[in-house]
UniProtKB/Swiss-Prot annotation:
Subcellular location: Cytoplasm
Highest taxon in the source lineage: Bacteria
Record HAMAP family: Tran_acon_Me_trans
Predominant location category: cytoplasm
Originating organism: Yersinia enterocolitica serotype O:8 / biotype 1B (strain NCTC 13174 / 8081)
UniProt catalytic activity: trans-aconitate + S-adenosyl-L-methionine = (E)-3-(methoxycarbonyl)pent-2-enedioate + S-adenosyl-L-homocysteine
Molecular function GO terms recorded: trans-aconitate 2-methyltransferase activity
Function as written in the Swiss-Prot or TrEMBL entry: Catalyzes the S-adenosylmethionine monomethyl esterification of trans-aconitate.
Entry EC no(s): 2.1.1.144
Protein name, per record: Trans-aconitate 2-methyltransferase
Single biological process term from Gene Ontology: methylation
Length: 258
């Protein structure tokens, strides 16, 4: 895919950062020396980590050069690395591996999660938050539009770019044999959005990318118009005119054996 657009992503930064704050709040009281922020994006999550652990060796990792440039501008004193999480291997075991809204883009979690857990120091923590919204109207509509337009052939693979996350039971069984403790929970956020168009704009920065990028500009506009029509019906106005965007997310905080 093309590089990410940090400016578009930051349009809803407060809403995107809230789960990162919630994940950080569930990390047990500790003083980690080495922290990696996997899929750091424009640095909003890295900034939270830096504020809580100002003395730690903190590194943000992302495969988007544009996102890393934005993160470096935000946090000039932090270290950022352009790398693929699947090939990432830290020089030293990590005390905290933090991944906010990034691992859902990677496949084969059966291999990925044990691998990441193996990069922890004794008593280290793996903290993960992943959107779990592929069955929500917002994402069902993407697949529906893709299957019913002149772009059908072009977008045959778009819906499989991001796989459905595993169940809580599966993640528990992957981590528990190597963990002192595994904490898993699921939260649905209800974001009041000013309009159906705002919901589309939110998703243009993330979930819609695999559907839009293969299309020519004219087809892209037509796709977005068809998508907006479905979103407008799927998320009716509330009493104040806003639309409630339900956004389920899965959280995992696991501590390695001592």
């Amino acid at each position: 895919m093309q590089d990410w657009d940090p400016d578009l992503y930051r349009q809803f930064e407060a809403e995107r950062t809230r789960p990162a704050r919630d994940l950080l709040a569930h990390i047990p009281a500790t003083i980690p020396q080495r922290i990696s922020d996997l899929g750091c994006g424009p640095g909003n999550s890295t900034q939270l980590l830096h504020q809580r652990f100002p003395d730690a060796q903190l590194m943000g990792i992302d495969n988007s050069r544009a996102m890393l440039l934005s993160a470096q501008q935000r946090l000039p004193d932090c270290v950022f690395l352009e790398a693929d999480i699947r090939q990432w291997q830290p020089a030293e075991p990590q005390d905290l591996i933090y991944a906010n809204a990034s691992l859902q883009w990677l496949t084969d979690h059966q291999q990925l999660f044990p691998y990441l857990f193996s990069q922890l120091a004794a008593n280290g923590i793996l903290a993960v938050q992943m959107p779990d919204n592929l069955d929500e109207p917002s994402h069902r509509a993407m697949r529906e539009v893709a299957e019913n337009g002149p772009w059908q052939q072009t977008l045959q693979e778009a819906g499989v770019v991001r796989a459905k996350v595993l169940t809580a039971n599966q993640y528990y069984d992957l981590l528990a044999p190597h963990a002192e403790q595994v904490d898993i929970w699921r939260t649905t956020y209800y974001h009041p959005m000013p309009s159906a168009q705002a919901i589309v704009d939110w998703l243009r920065a993330t979930g819609l990318r695999p559907f839009l990028e293969p299309l020519a500009e004219s087809m892209r506009l037509d796709f977005l118009q068809d998508y907006l029509t479905i979103i407008d019906a799927a998320y009716p106005q509330q009493v104040d005119g806003r639309r409630l965007l339900a956004f389920p997310r899965l959280f995992i905080v696991a501590r390695a054996l001592k």
